[in-house]
Amino acid sequence: MSEAYKTVYIGDTAEIVEKKSRFIANLEHVESEEEALAYIETIRKKYWDARHNCYAYCIGKKQELKRCSDDGEPSQTAGKPMLDVLTGAGLCDTVVVVTRYFGGTLLGTGGLVRAYTAAAKAGVEASEVIEKIPAVQFLVKVTYNQIGTLLYLLGQRGYSQLESEYAEDVSVRFLVPLTERASMEKQLLESFQGSAKTEIEDYGYYAKNGKELLLFEEEV
């Protein structure tokens, strides 16, 4: 069964300074290695005069593809710590590039690891992160006498209505997390003794960004 996963929804920029060296983190949502590499190249062109543009990315709903680069920094001091930040935060389909402008003072391997880690974390904190939840779209038709019961049930479960149509009957579309589909079908059957007409219309992912409901047409 498909599982929920976290990703950057809107990437942002963050900067830290360590012994006069500037570390600038840029994050972005990507859905393929090609998109990740294209974004990395964009950042390299933007900061063309920087000494290093180190990067890390995780692609896939279960972080199936993971890559990183130290871009000239000592081995394991930049890309790997940045990748650890992404994996530790559970971020999928995300790329981070940290640009370094050398400040004249050597940081040592330990200092570099701490600086690149801190920059990547600052970038994650500055970005908008969402959790995409696999869901099924229900269409339920009830009578006017039954609509109160249905809306109460949805409120109890914390489900968001997508659309309501009041005609001869009342039709309500709403999303149910995939893991709760069976229990929802059972509760509808018990609550309306089989009189409610229920259809499964679609599958996909949704996320909540504050009060905003985001819908994604992704294969579940």
Regions found by a protein language model. Name each.
Residues 50-54, 129-134, 162, 195-199:
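Flexible, glycine/charged-enriched surface loops at secondary-structure junctions
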Residues 16-20, 130-132, 165-166:
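Short, flexible turn/loop "capping" segments at secondary-structure junctions
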Residues 129-146:
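Short glycine-/aliphatic-rich beta-strand segments at the starts of folded cytosolic domains
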Residues 1-77, 181, 191, 199-220:
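C-terminal regulatory domains involved in ligand/effector binding and gene-expression control
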Residues 150-156, 183-192:
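Short amphipathic alpha-helices in soluble, non-transmembrane regions
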Residues 174-183:
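Terminal, non-globular segments
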Residues 78-127:
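Active-site beta-strand/loop microenvironment that shapes enzyme catalytic pockets
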Residues 141-159:
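Short amphipathic alpha-helix segments
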